[in-house]
Amino acid sequence: MKRILLITMIACITAVSSMAQTKSYRGFVEGGYGAFVGSKTGSVLSLSTSHGKMFGPVFVGGGIGIEQAWVKNESYIENYVSIGLFDGWRGVKTFKGINVPVFANIKGIWENKKISPTFDVKAGFNLGMAWGLLGEAGAGCRFDLGKTALSATAFIKGAYEEESLVSDDSKYVEGWFTSLGLKVAWEF
């Protein structure tokens, strides 16, 4: 019994040490808020994570997130009574929806100073309320805290909802969504 326990402990310790992160591995957890600009009005609250590797001062990785969006319905009609099966959207003041962005991520990070500039580019696909392609570009400042870092980034984000993917009851969400906002990221 002691021998089996010893072998099990050695196997567990070996497995844990073999999964240790390499020096070039980086992970980011980002929280952000954006406001829609252009033909759509509303806001979006987001939380995402990206993981990948550093190649010199450039991070290359991928990520996933979750966003809660509120879009004002410009076609809202007070006390609207639905006539057809799918025209009830006219009686809704605000659409609330969840998006799940899946993206590739490239960041430029200059690590030789306590405070340094950064850039961030994301491209991918949105699943949820705004189903379609997405792109995001941002620039900001990184604060080195030793083994970890914080960064603040101002961004512009675009998501495209194709008309053919939209059902009749959510006609307002078709077309381009563009938002401006601020993200704060924790780097590990």
Over which residues does each language-model region extend?
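Bacterial Sec-dependent N-terminal signal peptides
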Residues: 1-25, 184, 188
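Residues that line or immediately flank small-molecule/substrate-binding pockets and catalytic motifs
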Residues: 8, 32-33, 66
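Short glycine/proline- and aromatic-enriched beta-strand/turn motifs that initiate or cap beta-hairpins
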Residues: 19-55, 59, 164, 187
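Residues that define the transmembrane beta-barrel architecture of outer-membrane proteins
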Residues: 23-27, 41-45, 96-102, 115, ...
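Extracytoplasmic loops and strand-loop junctions of Gram-negative outer membrane beta-barrel proteins
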Residues: 30-34, 86-90, 121-123, 164-167
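Feature marks short, surface-exposed loop/turn motifs that line or immediately flank catalytic pockets
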Residues: 35-37, 68-70, 125-127, 158-164
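Gram-negative (and chloroplast) outer-membrane scaffold detector with strong preference
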Residues: 49-152
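A generic hydrophobic-segment detector
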Residues: 132-188
